[in-house]
Amino acid sequence: MDKYELVKDIGAGNFGVARLMRVKNSKELVAMKYIERGPKIDENVAREIINHRSLRHPNIIRFKEVVLTPTHIAIAMEYAAGGELFERICSAGRFSEDEARYFFQQLISGVSYCHAMQICHRDLKLENTLLDGSPAPRLKICDFGYSKSSLLHSMPKSTVGTPAYIAPEVLSRGEYDGKMADVWSCGVTLYVMLVGAYPFEDQEDPKNFKKTIQRIMAVKYKIPDYVHISQDCKHLLSRIFVTNSNKRITIGDIKKHPWFLKNLPRELTEIAQAAYFRKENPTFSLQSVEEIMKIVEEAKTPARVSRSIGAFGWGGGEDAEGKEEDAEEEVEEVEEEEDEEDEYDKTVKQVHASMGEVRVS
């Protein structure tokens, strides 16, 4: 960790804390995601790191390295200065059709690459799509904590993901094609960009999970009258929001759809993208899989001394104590978020119990 210096805290989530760090020698900024050593270091963490390491594409956040500290495992990755796509939509309310298409084209490009690498994301959402700091922002997919690789694992069975983005077959709790579930989530992302609301939530009762799930299973959505979009766009959404995943449009066919192809940037064309699909392409990370797995195994051993994330000793100085207090507050917030998520999981189970076994026709 000596090669990095702390710049600022940039967020907290169920995983732990994220910080903006600077490489001392090169002055390069990186995002560092910290996960506490011990029981939190499970197969999901290992899978996220190994899957992320294998990906090399301009629409995917670059993995750099994993580092072990006395208290945490730290995952260093590319820093996206433009923040979340979610924040951009919150500021704008909703996007024009052209702007939504611009970001959707990049999203599909990144997801298509993941699928070609036999990795399905399983938690695609606006909060997991970041933007770089350029004037015409480049979209970057991040957070591979739930992703599954068909090269390493069996078919996904667990119900993961954010409620509003979950495909019907995932709610059915049987085996499902993770790639087709990703297509559904991409459709939800497109809808939110166009409308500024989630397609299957009751706007007057958004926290009613039972109603949301019923609407997802019935594919009950509509484009509000105040949103004016082309017939091609409506057609694409209707091909994505299909209950039976076998009849849903594939990523390959989305890339051939007239709406997708309109104003497609040259770097996203099939010819330009071919360069990223070469098997001999090196990864961004110099760490081998063996080195990474060794660090992950070590991280399963809890820290001997309980120490806040602010006590890592970067930057020191007069404000170190204040930073430690801030970090402790962040950890408390994370714990609260985890409690909320646990509550949601309970609610989903209750919904399933009240609805009986949900089936996809």
UniProtKB/Swiss-Prot annotation:
GO cellular component terms attached to this protein's record? cytosol; nucleus
Task: Report, as the record phrases it, the tissue specificity of this protein.
Answer: Expressed in seedlings.
Q: Which PROSITE patterns does this one have?
A: PROTEIN_KINASE_ATP, PROTEIN_KINASE_DOM, PROTEIN_KINASE_ST
Domain Protein kinase as annotated: residue spans: 4-260
Report residues binding ATP: I10, G11, A12, G13, N14, F15, G16, V17, A18, K33
Record field: compositional bias (Acidic residues) = 318-344
- As recorded in UniProt, its EC number(s) are 2.7.11.1
What GO terms in the biological process aspect are recorded for it? lateral root development; response to osmotic stress; response to salt stress
Mention any Pfam family matching this sequence: Pkinase
The enzyme's first-digit EC class, named in words, is: transferase
Quick check: keyword Hydrolase in the entry? Answer: no
According to the record, the residues making up region (Disordered) are 311-361
Modification sites for Phosphoserine:
S154
Q: Supply the SUPFAM superfamilies for this chain.
A: Protein kinase-like (PK-like)
The record's active-site residues are: D123
Q: Supply the induction statement.
A: By salt and osmotic stress (at protein level).
Q: Which domain of life is it from?
A: Eukaryota
Note the InterPro entries from the entry: Kinase-like_dom_sf (IPR011009), Prot_kinase_dom (IPR000719), Protein_kinase_ATP_BS (IPR017441), Ser/Thr_kinase_AS (IPR008271)
Q: What Gene Ontology molecular-function terms does this entry list?
A: ATP binding; kinase activity; phosphatidic acid binding; protein kinase activity; protein serine kinase activity; protein serine/threonine kinase activity
**Keyword terms, alphabetized:** ATP-binding, Kinase, Nucleotide-binding, Phosphoprotein, Serine/threonine-protein kinase, Transferase
Catalytic activity reads: L-seryl-[protein] + ATP = O-phospho-L-seryl-[protein] + ADP + H(+); L-threonyl-[protein] + ATP = O-phospho-L-threonyl-[protein] + ADP + H(+)
**Family label:** Belongs to the protein kinase superfamily. Ser/Thr protein kinase family.
The protein's name: Serine/threonine-protein kinase SRK2B
Species the sequence originates in: Arabidopsis thaliana (Mouse-ear cress)
Q: Which gene encodes it?
A: SRK2B
